[in-house]
């Protein structure tokens, strides 16, 4: 298209040049005629010279017209070549472009689906990690609270051993009055220690005369007394203790069990 416009401009310019050149030739011819009228007495040689000049001018005009026509012919040939090489799509080209477009659309759909799946997977992973972390915090909290709650467990277990021995000494028969006065002081100390342990959450497990419970009692001996209820602790061999809600030492008991004989 640009070359076609250039061709039109070139044609217009050549036409203008031709008109201007013809005008110049006409002016020269008029000038020559005036000179011939005014100088009729000029010699034949001078007249011959003017004729030669006029011939040269006509010859130049013919050459200029020939060149301009040649340029116009070349421009027309160039436009024809451009039009002959112009791309004209056919049905196969349209089908190929349509197939490429459909392929791109399908690829776009697949990419969107993959992106959504990746986003959903990442969301699920984040939720799983958050849930795991929340459970971990809960376990740590429970464990920490338990450790704080039962921080004195080992200490209480250790102090109960000499305390039981201390009680056995206090239960011995009193023979001498001087010993009785010492025992009275020991009883006061024993009571103070028990009060301190009780404030810390230590209490004695009830065992005598109650039904045997494997969670709190440990049977060292068994008897079969039909006069007493079945499954009852008839004797406490060693005291048991609770620290808050934790059994730090089960009660050692003798259990009355006669159900087997009774069934016989």
From Swiss-Prot:
Bias kind Basic and acidic residues: ranges: 36-49
Molecular functions per Gene Ontology: adenyl-nucleotide exchange factor activity; protein homodimerization activity; protein-folding chaperone binding; unfolded protein binding
Pfam families: GrpE (PF01025)
GO process terms (BP): protein folding
Record region (Disordered): 36-59
Keywords: Chaperone, Cytoplasm, Stress response
Cross-referenced Gene3D superfamilies: 3.90.20.20, Head domain of nucleotide exchange factor GrpE
Compartments where located: Cytoplasm
A single Gene Ontology CC term: cytoplasm
Family statement drawn from the similarity comment of this UniProt entry: Belongs to the GrpE family.
Role of this protein: Participates actively in the response to hyperosmotic and heat shock by preventing the aggregation of stress-denatured proteins, in association with DnaK and GrpE. It is the nucleotide exchange factor for DnaK and may function as a thermosensor. Unfolded proteins bind initially to DnaJ; upon interaction with the DnaJ-bound protein, DnaK hydrolyzes its bound ATP, resulting in the formation of a stable complex. GrpE releases ADP from DnaK; ATP binding to DnaK triggers the release of the substrate protein, thus completing the reaction cycle.
Assembly with partners or alone: Homodimer.
Entries under HAMAP family matching the protein: GrpE
Name this polypeptide is given: Protein GrpE
Organism name: Peanut witches'-broom phytoplasma
């Amino acid at each position: 298209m640009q070359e076609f416009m250039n061709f039109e401009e070139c044609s217009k310019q050549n036409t203008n040049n031709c008109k201007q050149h013809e005008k110049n030739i006409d002016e020269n011819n008029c000038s020559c005629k005036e000179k011939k009228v005014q100088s009729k007495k000029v010699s034949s040689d001078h007249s011959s010279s003017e004729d030669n000049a006029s011939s040269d001018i006509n010859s130049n005009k013919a050459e200029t017209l020939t060149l301009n026509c040649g340029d116009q012919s070349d421009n027309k040939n160039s436009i024809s070549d451009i039009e002959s090489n112009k791309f004209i799509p056919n049905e196969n080209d349209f089908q190929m472009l349509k197939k490429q477009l459909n392929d791109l659309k399908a690829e776009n759909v697949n990419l969107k689906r993959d992106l959504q799946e990746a986003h959903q997977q990442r969301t699920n992973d984040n939720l799983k990690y958050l849930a795991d972390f929340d459970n971990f915090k809960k376990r740590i909290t429970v464990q920490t609270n338990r450790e704080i709650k039962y921080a004195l467990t080992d200490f209480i277990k250790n102090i109960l051993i000499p305390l039981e021995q201390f009680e056995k000494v206090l239960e011995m028969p009193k023979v001498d009055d001087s010993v009785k006065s010492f025992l009275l002081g020991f009883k006061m100390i024993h009571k103070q220690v028990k009060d301190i342990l009780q404030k810390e959450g230590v209490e004695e497990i009830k065992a005598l005369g109650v039904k045997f419970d494997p969670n709190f009692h440990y049977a060292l001996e068994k008897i079969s007394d039909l006069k007493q209820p079945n499954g009852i602790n008839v004797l406490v061999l060693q005291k048991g203790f609770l620290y808050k809600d934790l059994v730090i030492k089960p009660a050692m008991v003798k259990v009355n069990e006669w159900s087997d004989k009774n069934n016989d």
